[in-house]
Amino acid sequence: MTTFGTPLSPHATKVMLLGSGELGKEVLIALQRLGVETIATDRYDNAPGQQVAHHARTITMSDPAQLKSLIEKERPHLVVPEIEAIATAMLEELEAAGTVRVIPTARAARLTMDREGIRRLAAETLGLPTSPYVFCDSLQELQAAIDTNIGYPCIVKPVMSSSGKGQSKIAGPADVKTAWDYAMAGGRVSHGRVIVEGFIDFDYEITQLTVRALGADGQVETHFCEPIGHIQVSGDYVESWQPHPMREAALQKSRAIAKAVTDDLGGQGLFGVELFVKGDEVWFSEVSPRPHDTGMVTMCTQWQNEFELHARAILGLPVNTALKSSGASAVIYGGVDAKGIVFDGVADALRVPNTDIRLFGKPESFVKRRMGVALAFDADVEVARANAKLAASRVKPRVAKG
């Protein structure tokens, strides 16, 4: 796009997000700063992104009829999936009919909506290094795959879930049924199918944020952010930092893998490519065709954060992935199961040097629900990590009184 309209006018440039959580909220803000009219869609009312968008819509996004009806009614220029649980076959149908452009493409949305599509693409089509894996449809198949192929320890995940839900490590035979039951409970759209992966004894894991954006000649160029290190607990990110130190050979392999998979997915936008690293060896893990939770650290480390990069790239604008400072992020959990909670300690948190926080505005809290994030920058990334965790620890969510 080279011309942008005025929001809420007949010539507005309209973008619809499918999924409006904390990541979508920041994308919406970035789009609005560029004069875009925004439509925030989610499965529940008052989702974080709906609180800041021009228009809020609530539907079951995995229902093809509801999704088609909404897109045909709103007629956005772009549809931007921000979650996996979407009727992607309908997106492909609408894209093929010329009704809408899907970011990055409808095919990419379909392939990345579950772990099977993207793993088969990476390992079987592109030949990228991955952990050994088997897909299973029953507890019996899971046990057989472990016994004959994968071995112990191993990792079990639902084919579709988010934020690590349903993911667990199996140390031995006694853990298999528990892991299966947990995966069935944690799948976002349960089809009774899991992936079991051989355990890689990696040194660390990173997210390689990769941006496909138009260059001055109108051709797609690939840009890389500095690698983001992160720690996950049960598959859910709890802290991240940027940059993560890497050997040059490992860095180049990481970027080659990221480019291979994002080139195949195509389109424009930011992708979060997760990788395991041991020495100079690198294995592909997963990819999301959208901003990544570990990439929230870029709100304090880059001149253009991951949300601004995504917004610019999908609109056909130039991008800048340069780092401005080392930094870190740490998750603020809900700590309680309640609606409309309040947060104490915000001022104390912000007294930690060089810190900031984001409270997402989710209408309902759970003990382990991500309700905010603390950010910290420092020339020394380890100082930034310590400060981010300290700031996060000072924010105290609680049930509102009265």
Swiss-Prot record:
GO biological process: 'de novo' IMP biosynthetic process
Domain ATP-grasp per the UniProt entry, residue ranges: 120-315
Any one Gene Ontology molecular-function term assigned to this protein's record: phosphoribosylglycinamide formyltransferase 2 activity
One term under GO cellular component: cytosol
Superkingdom of this protein's organism: Bacteria
Similarity comment: family membership: Belongs to the PurK/PurT family.
Assembly mode: Homodimer.
Its biological purpose: Involved in the de novo purine biosynthesis. Catalyzes the transfer of formate to 5-phospho-ribosyl-glycinamide (GAR), producing 5-phospho-ribosyl-N-formylglycinamide (FGAR). Formate is provided by PurU via hydrolysis of 10-formyl-tetrahydrofolate.
Protein name stated in the entry: Formate-dependent phosphoribosylglycinamide formyltransferase
Gene from which this protein is expressed: purT
